Design a protein with these regions (language model features):
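Terminus-proximal functional modules
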Residues: 1-83
Length: 83
């Protein structure tokens, strides 16, 4: 089962980010989060964004990225990639 994702979209509605916990990590001392980046293609909501990259960060670093994006005008949004 995939971890619940948390989503952000930029103010131009051209890019999205999905933050999900990496439940498969074997590190017993740190939690890790995947940050998936995608580009909106076509009409938003009609087609899934094009996945451009996946990066993995420690939880604290992922929180800093989230906060930085929010400060730059990104907003929470609903899921845009299917399960």
């Amino acid at each position: 089962m995939m971890a619940r994702g948390y989503w952000l979209i930029n103010s131009n509605r051209t890019e999205v980010r999905r933050f999900t916990e990496n439940r498969a990590s074997e590190d017993q001392f740190n939690k890790y989060v995947f940050v998936d980046s995608g580009k909106i293609v076509g009409v938003f909501g009609k087609e899934a964004p094009l996945l451009q990259r996946r990066e993995e960060f420690k939880l604290d670093d992922a929180r800093k990225i989230w906060e930085k994006l929010i400060s730059q005008g990104w907003r929470r949004t609903e899921e845009v990639w299917s399960k």
